[in-house]
Amino acid sequence: MADISVHPSTWPLYVWLSLLVALPAVTFLYDAVTWFRMPPGPTPLPFIGNKLQLPKSKPWVQFQEWSKKYGPIYTIWIGRRPTVIISDPAIATELMETRSSKYSSRPRMVAMGELLWDGASILVKPYGKEWSVRRRLLHLALTPKALRLYKPVQEAEASRLAYGLLGRPNDYVKLIETFTSSVVFCVAYGHRIDSLNAKVIGQRFEFMHYSASLNVPGKYLVETIPALKHVPDFLAPWKKDIKKHGLKEAAANMDLVDVVRGDIARAEQESSKEKLPDSLCKILLEMRETENIPLSDRDFSFVPASLFGAGSDTTASTMCTAFLALITHPETLEAAQAELDAVIGPDRTPAFEDEANLSYIRALVKEVLRWRPVAVLGGTPHASTEDDHYEGYYIPAGTTVLGNSWAINLNEEYYPNPHHFNPLRFLDGNIAARVKQAPMTTVHLGEKHDLELGGKAHPSKSGHSSFGWGRRICPGANLAANSLYIALAKLLWAYDIKPIPGRTYDTFKYTEGFNIRPQPFECIIRIRSDKHKIVLEGEMEHAETYLEKFTPFGE
């Protein structure tokens, strides 16, 4: 028998051949044992997993189909890395909220998280102290008290949106994007947006689209072989390009902080600091003067910047979905306007103080969020940090956990006839105690609907799963919900939003990507009466006066 205890360079050829066979065999055996212990899913191929079975377009639809075959929790494999897909809100809540101490991290994202952002963004930060610091700072702008302070801004911006549609109804998408962007920039930096041609808006959309392009499974080999991140830039042009974009975004973020720093300095010189609008960036800069914030200037600048991605584009996409829902389900517009006419009347537009009395409008906002969730795959995936078991299945540490919001929000066990847009699902004050009612029941608005209130009770208070779960839930969820309420309430009070006669609308025709919105469509947006127009013109004057203190960013 050959002695192989000596240096490997002296080993016989058959020893090397044996190792070449044994190592893959042992690896395959280990993966197979793990595969059998995890929630069952489509059979993976050795070493490449289910890559060949993953669709290049709209994977959430395929994931929904697999849930019908394999159940509400199953596993797919990207190479040798397991991903648990969840299609039931109760399971998502159990794992990512009840057991949040185990499921609040992020999978490693080399291209986007490490090369582009160098770990600065809270979006991709693993769960731990550094994430907690950023989350705490971000929450300073999103406390209940802070959210109340932003309501006048949101009302004024919603009035500008409603007035803008008088002269530019065909530009409703751009006007909506201006509205959502301006709200977020007022909150983050104390400056408004008057036009999408503003330089800062062009930059934000460029950064957002580029980062999204990096977060595509299989696009970069570095996600499978992380060691490739250490290849010198001159040998890896793809890496050089990513880092170049990262430096550009970081510089833009720090420029915005410098703008607010300059605002504070001028206000102090002029003894007019009380006139300077509060913003997250202003609050953080003042905090930095009195306490230690363990972040570099670069990392610090990413905190207020993160509000744009969390609350601007996604809210605009939801508003576009609302328009699509209204023109394909015209009975909802009639019901909404019946409530608005009864509660508000013709002499003013709705305000936040009316929200408690506008139960149908509140329900409509929730149904929009449920019907076509923007973050179809639940936003950025979670990752487990400890070995765990669920219903007898093994979930090892390091598993990517993905809540398929598309499948969850369209789960027929919770939402009968789920593709029918029906705000009445959310009219019951206690959503968790919904009771199935007979179809075509007449409600107090005089509207007839298939109430579709049967099914299981959703575990969350909101009744849907569109903002994520647990410690990783979207921090701007309440800010976004407030913007949706006030904008839709004012627009439905003022306008008839209807389909073009003879036009067919496809409610499944949405963009690609991890955040979706309807493909561009035309509709009729017509002011309801001359009196409504006069009210909008008057409220526009008040809105412009209020927003004067929020200096606009230039083009």
Regions found by a protein language model. Give the residues of each.
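Conserved cytochrome P450 K-helix/beta-meander segment immediately N-terminal to the heme-binding cysteine loop
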Residues: G403-G454, M540-E541
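N-terminal membrane-proximal hinge/A-helix region immediately C-terminal to the signal-anchor transmembrane segment
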Residues: A2-W117, K129, V133, P152-R160, ...
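Cytochrome P450 catalytic-core helices
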Residues: T180, T314-T332, Q337-E339, N478-W493
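Cytochrome P450 catalytic-domain "roof"
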Residues: K58-V84, S105-P126, R136-I193, A250-E270, ...
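Cytochrome P450 I-helix active-site segment
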Residues: T43, G202-M208, Q269-K282, A325-A375, ...
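Cytochrome P450 heme-thiolate "Cys pocket" and heme-binding signature region
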Residues: A120, A305, F352, E391, ...
